[in-house]
Amino acid sequence: MQKAQRIIKTYRRNRMIVCTICALVTLASTLSVRFISQRNLNQQRVVQFANHAVEELDKVLLPLQAGSEVLLPLIGLPCSVAHLPLRKQAAKLQTVRSIGLVQDGTLYCSSIFGYRNVPVVDILAELPAPQPLLRLTIDRALIKGSPVLIQWTPAAGSSNAGVMEMINIDLLTAMLLEPQLPQISSASLTVDKRHLLYGNGLVDSLPQPEDNENYQVSSQRFPFTINVNGPGATALAWHYLPTQLPLAVLLSLLVGYIAWLATAYRMSFSREINLGLAQHEFELFCQPLLNARSQQCIGVEILLRWNNPRQGWISPDVFIPIAEEHHLIVPLTRYVMAETIRQRHVFPMSSQFHVGINVAPSHFRRGVLIKDLNQYWFSAHPIQQLILEITERDALLDVDYRIARELHRKNVKLAIDDFGTGNSSFSWLETLRPDVLKIDKSFTAAIGSDAVNSTVTDIIIALGQRLNIELVAEGVETQEQAKYLRRHGVHILQGYLYAQPMPLRDFPKWLAGSQPPPARHNGHITPIMPLR
């Protein structure tokens, strides 16, 4: 008792440490996640803003570029002829302020004014040019002083002729570059070396506020750049973080409390299981399997019982699920393999005698089961036929079917235990190709009743016969059930009608024909327990 109390005291101290660590990690993780997500959100908004502005301006300029190709053939025609097509094109392109035709360096026809005789160099010093240009400048003719964006398209084979389109860029930027606080303090359009700053018109250089960050996106189609200025995603995230502290503290306290509740029993019990394995507190029991026709014992199912000196007999219904949850089911299975081999002398020395051992699907992962069988079973060269009964507590999807094929190659039979009650699927029968289906005792108990399970029992039997799979009925307790199962072609029967689970050392006496003795352990009669 003293040792158990010491274990509990140590566990409680460790439990407090674990819960405190969980709470602190939750606090730090929550704040970190909120900081990172807010920073990413800030950055995403800046990027989306700039990309949206670039995309929209591209959409404006692309039709102008296509339209200028249509207007190039008008160069050289009299303005009286070209004026109407210019006006129609300007009307179609709603963002255009005016379109002009240039020949010999002179703007001679405008969509607004008609005939003109203005040197184009007076409008923009870089015109005419032999290559396409995009420039920001000031309108000196129509709306004097307002910014415009000029797109120049030269005529083929000429450096003094082309189409000049003036775009109402001020209106566009007013819609596209309006700052979005707090992420974006200011935005501007840069073409060549001039900048159109929202709310400030054309400037030759952009202001650089202290502690602000600048983000730029350039168009892949046209020579312009969108500049976005703001306090920066990281700085804003730090500024926003204190508002998340109350929620993070509450969440960390909640996680700490949940961890305290979750570890109250399960962690201590996992320690008990490890201790039980180390001190060999687990004992192997077996339940005979009888041939349905001859009534002769043809095998056993190995069962595990735990006589805990600190808490008394513990049912498999208690320790098996907890062992699975804490990843201790594989060590328990290894223990069963080792003890079965050590006591194999209690079984008939016949290759026709079956020894069934339960394994979890998780044991199939990464070839662990093959390694364990090589170490504990095959190395001893037992004569008896090994049957691995795959339990359905875990999803059978965990089974590595390559391992299943390797087991068949090694002459190990596979059985699906408690078929129809867990995670199995009929489609897996074809993939796994089991040799045996074990009908769960709940279906056996329904025999002779009107319960739905009675119909399911018939379906399982028919399925096994159709697939040529050997059938074992568990939980046979009455002669009526046994007769029904024999009549319907079930090959092997198992249940209290024939024998209760017994320690392995008592099996030879039972097999010799004596009455099944009371199950004992260390001189004490054990309670009757369920098979699982």
Swiss-Prot record:
Q: What membrane topology does this protein have?
A: Multi-pass membrane protein
Which keywords does UniProt give here? c-di-GMP, Cell membrane, Hydrolase, Membrane, Transmembrane, Transmembrane helix
Reported induction: Expressed at 28 degrees Celsius in late stationary phase, constitutively expressed at low levels at 37 degrees Celsius, more highly expressed on plates than in liquid medium. Expression is RpoS- and CsgD-dependent.
Localisation per UniProt entry: Cell membrane
Q: Which Pfam families match?
A: CSS-motif (PF12792), EAL (PF00563)
Q: What is its EC number?
A: 3.1.4.52
Effect of deleting the gene: Cells lacking this gene show increased aggregation, increased cellulose production but no increase in surface attachment.
Which positions, given as ranges, span the membrane? 16-36, 245-265
Broad class of enzyme this protein falls into: hydrolase
GO CC, sorted alphabetically, is: plasma membrane
What reaction gets catalysed by this protein?
3',3'-c-di-GMP + H2O = 5'-phosphoguanylyl(3'->5')guanosine + H(+)
Q: What GO molecular functions are on record for this protein?
A: cyclic-guanylate-specific phosphodiesterase activity
Q: Which GO biological process categories is it annotated with?
A: DNA damage response; regulation of single-species biofilm formation
Ranges for domain EAL come to: 266-515
Organism superkingdom: Bacteria
| Keyword NAD in annotation | no
As for what it does, the entry says: Phosphodiesterase (PDE) that catalyzes the hydrolysis of cyclic-di-GMP (c-di-GMP) to 5'-pGpG. May serve as a negative regulator of cellulose synthesis (as has been suggested for S.typhimurium); overexpression inhibits cell aggregation in strains able to produce adhesive curli fimbriae. Cyclic-di-GMP is a second messenger which controls cell surface-associated traits in bacteria.
Tell me what this protein is called. Answer: Probable cyclic di-GMP phosphodiesterase PdeD
